[in-house]
Amino acid sequence: TYAEVESFGVGQSATAVYTAPGDGRDLNITIDADGGYVIHMDYRFDWGGNPSTGKPWEDILILNSKPAQTWGPQQHVNNFYFTPGTHVTLGDKSNDGHFAIIADGIQVATYDHRLPVNSVKEVKFSTTAGSGTDIWDLLLLP
């Protein structure tokens, strides 16, 4: 699911309203610009390796940008959990110099702008095939 954007700037937000996946699949929201990702929010139920424990990360929200062909350093929001099958919201609001990352109406993180927010062209919501995630709405708010 995606929405093309004519303009996007400070004070605007992009939010997905959906049913939380019940089988551990990932889902993400990406705000695209010309030739890169302004912000990519990726929820992972079970992912990679945590160097502190040697086990996979669990219930983590990964924030990142991709200015050109290379991803930047990741920012993690640990212990990020949605109850499977529940109706939830995940989004961001562009503030002066950073995004406020908001889940179910609560700010869970901030993420510094790495690309100009006025370069945004598209907002995408996607999930791993077969996850049982139903998108209810993709909201772009002034």
Curated annotation (Swiss-Prot):
Matches recorded under PROSITE patterns: GALECTIN
Statement: the UniProt record of this protein carries the keyword Cytoplasm: no
Activity-regulation annotation: Cytotoxic activity against L.infantum promastigotes is completely inhibited by D-galactose. Inhibition activity against biofilm formation by S.aureus and S.epidermidis is inhibited by alpha-lactose. Hemagglutination activity is inhibited by alpha-lactose (MIC=100 mM), beta-lactose (MIC=100 mM), lactulose (MIC=100 mM), bovine submaxillary mucin (BSM) (MIC=32 ug/ml), fetuin (MIC=16 ug/ml), porcine stomach mucin (PSM) type 2 (MIC=8 ug/ml) and PSM type 3 (MIC=8 ug/ml).
Keyword Iron-sulfur applies: no
An example molecular function term from Gene Ontology annotations: protein homodimerization activity
GO biological process, one term: defense response to Gram-negative bacterium
Protein name: Galactose-binding lectin
Species this protein is from: Chondrilla caribensis (Chicken liver sponge)
